[in-house]
């Protein structure tokens, strides 16, 4: 389960940011998880709740924003939104299959609420 190593790296990054801003406590962590990132949200939550103990995040709430796939069509230049379970991706505007994924592949630390 690679979510454990992801959470450990995330907690290190959070602690680094908290120290940089002289924060004593993190109250909320917001992450955006792309559906193609390979990160399972429920496993990330379990890992976060396990590893946050004894850190500045010990009382922090984890908010997860699940990001669908957004692809830009190279033919018509419009963006289309897809769910992970779609088997075939084609532009929802013109039907072309020459698409560039522009969102939905990453996990990003979006926001920290600190005191």
From Swiss-Prot:
Q: Where does Ni(2+) bind?
A: 2
Record-level Gene Ontology MF annotations: nickel cation binding; zinc ion binding
Q: Does the keyword Metal-binding apply?
A: yes
Leader sequence range is none
Q: Which Pfam families did the record assign? A: HypA (PF01155)
Q: Which UniProt keywords apply?
A: Metal-binding, Nickel, Zinc
Residues given in the record as Zn(2+) binding sites: 73, 76, 91, 94
Question: GO:BP terms for this protein?
Answer: protein maturation; protein modification process
Going by the entry's taxonomy, the superkingdom of the source organism is recorded as Bacteria
Keyword Transmembrane assigned to the entry: answer is no
Under InterPro entries, the record lists:
Hydgase_Ni_incorp_HypA/HybF_CS, HypA/HybF
Q: Provide the family line.
A: Belongs to the HypA/HybF family.
- Name the NCBIfam families on file: hypA
Function, please?
Involved in the maturation of [NiFe] hydrogenases. Required for nickel insertion into the metal center of the hydrogenase.
Identify this protein by name: Hydrogenase maturation factor HypA
Which gene carries the instructions for this protein? hypA
